Amino acid sequence: MSIGEVKAALDEASQLLDQGRTTVEGIGDSLNEAAELMLATLHDSGRDEAEKARRAVAEAVREVKLALRVITAAQESGDDFRRALG
């Protein structure tokens, strides 16, 4: 694989990561909307199921944030390597 091919592959990967970020951000937005509705609905509920649902939503929100951080780190790493290639 030539340097040019590596650069092209890195550029394509960066574009795919942008698409992935957009998708995950959309999922996060939908999740936040659903979480607000769920939390409002379960506001006064002390049932175990309600607490499990609250924890599950909080975990899902954390996972979305983690996925976005991983995408950012991957893109930054690829960009750094691309710059190092010249």
Question: Which positions does each model-derived feature cover?
Answer:
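Amphipathic alpha-helical hairpins/coiled-coils and adjacent low-complexity
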Residues: 1-86
